[in-house]
Amino acid sequence: MVRPKQSIQSHRKDEHVFLAEKFHQDDRQNDFDGLRFIHQSLPELAIADVDISTQFAGTTWQSPFYINGMTGGSQQTKKLNAQLAQVAQIAGLPMATGSQSVAIKDPTLVDTFSVIREFNPAGFILANIGAGNDLSVAQKAVAMTQANALEIHVNTAQEVVMPEGDREFYWLDQIGEIVANLDVPVIVKEVGFGMSAETIAKLQSVGVTNIDVSGKGGTNFVTIENERRRDKAYDYLSDWGQSTVESLFESQAFQTELTILASGGIRNPLDIVKALRLGASAVGISGQILHMLIKTGPTETAEQLLAWQAQIQSIMAILGARNLTALQSAPMILSPNLRHYLNERHLSL
């Protein structure tokens, strides 16, 4: 039997997974290490008193973290999406798909994304497309997985370094059109380069109310795309962007009006709690969960993520925080580098 030739787009999806795992580092340092909670010896509560649930677009998520957009678009990534959907179902986590643009261009790849709904029929699923797509593409992406919400990713740095990437970035008006007309909530997200206050203000101006600031510190798409280039020409951009912590600082002035989500460089439950303390309503995790899945399989990954939920509850109990609102008042100190960033950007915590 002759196997059908894999498309360029499908091959790229497989390359992304391979390179994300190749460059994954469990012990990688990032700006979450520059945040320290002040220990509270008398929290005056029980662990059972702590509520870790959060609200998103009128729905309650029992966990304050979710599986962020990763993959799909090839037979290999179909298997990964099926396993991730199993993990999401067992652990009770919302889950985002990877970019579905490839399946909208090539309908033979639809099942590499729709498999998520097959394996998690009652779960909260977020569809995913790139900025620059119009309303009809957004509607097709949502229908493909019967999604509860849509992520639109903005990824100029990745596109510039990607050999076959886009070279025109007139995105804002189309984002606004989708937000105004789509039947499900829309999240606009970065892909690991962070967001500035200026970017957040522009998104707010066209009606965006949900933003994932997705900063550097984890999966690095400049490094991944540069590795795919023959000339390796953009290695000097490997540190481009704002960290997730810096991006949460940038979002401070908008947090009462917008729902801010955080992702990028999340390694453990303490990182999640720190992001929630800085104002994130929920925290997305991609690379760390993919690494767990590849190394241990779906059952052990789900068990680990259930353990993370219990550990988040325990950390909040140590801090005397009964819920996420109380957590945002927990005393915290910053490293000199983070304090310098706040000063240079005229921001406050």
UniProtKB/Swiss-Prot annotation:
SUPFAM superfamilies: FMN-linked oxidoreductases (SSF51395). GO terms for cellular component: cytoplasm. GO terms for biological process: isoprenoid biosynthetic process. Coiled coil: none annotated. Mg(2+) binds at residue 159. It is an enzyme of class 5 (isomerase). It holds the Pfam family FMN_dh. It catalyses: isopentenyl diphosphate = dimethylallyl diphosphate. Substrate binds at residues 12-13, 158. The keyword Transmembrane does not apply. Belongs to the IPP isomerase type 2 family. Homooctamer. Dimer of tetramers. This is Isopentenyl-diphosphate delta-isomerase. It comes from Latilactobacillus sakei subsp. sakei (strain 23K). The gene is fni.
